[in-house]
Amino acid sequence: TIKLAKVLEVAVNAQINAGWFGPDVHTRPTSKYDDVENKIDLIAEIDIHSQGLTAHVALGIDVTYAQELKGKISRIQGEIIKNELATVKYYQSQDGHFTGSLNDIPRLVIGVDEERAGIIAKAWYKKNPALKKDPLREQILIELIDQCEAFANYADRMGSAKAAASYRRTKKLLLKVYGSEVTAQKRQEFGKDKVFRQLQILINSL
């Protein structure tokens, strides 16, 4: 599963940079240090030039079981309770204009079940052009948007204004990328993925 998670991380990174989320979103893998110590696999740069909106998002990608996913969400809860956000120690921006640490970035999880991850990994390895329109693109965006909403509301209840504002701002940007509000029908559709379903249960119970 660890090997599959790594292949999925590489595949998702490649697809996002090939235009999965449009021209305004790019991702970069983190350093080995930040992967191991800070549990962050990718940094997403969302840069909507037309409206002067820019944000960095720390992404952890997991092909995992419910118990492990719960630990990821608990870590985010712990950061929010302390009104903290994620930190990446070693980072270079996509355009090369920035090198250094990134502080106070929202942490989110991308969850895909083992069966689905295997299909994506195989399609990526074979350079299957159908991957450009794979439903996982939409599933990931819904996961990220729903987490932003849940973590912002949780931060409100914890009195963590900085965290709440950061997650709300990120949700606003992700909704612009997605292009519409997320419907219950879409959530039900992607609920066939066991990890997507478990993620929904966890964030709805915060």
Regions found by a protein language model. Give the residues of each.
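Extended aliphatic helical segments
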Residues: 7-12, 25, 36, 57, ...
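Active-site or metal-binding loop neighborhoods of secreted/extracellular toxin and effector enzymes
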Residues: 99-206
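Generic structural signal for short, flexible, solvent-exposed coil/loop and linker residues
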Residues: 31, 50, 97-99, 140
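Residue-identity detector for glutamine
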Residues: 15, 51, 67, 77, ...
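Catalytic cores of nucleic-acid endonucleases
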Residues: 56-59, 63-130
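Catalytic centers of nucleases
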Residues: 4-69
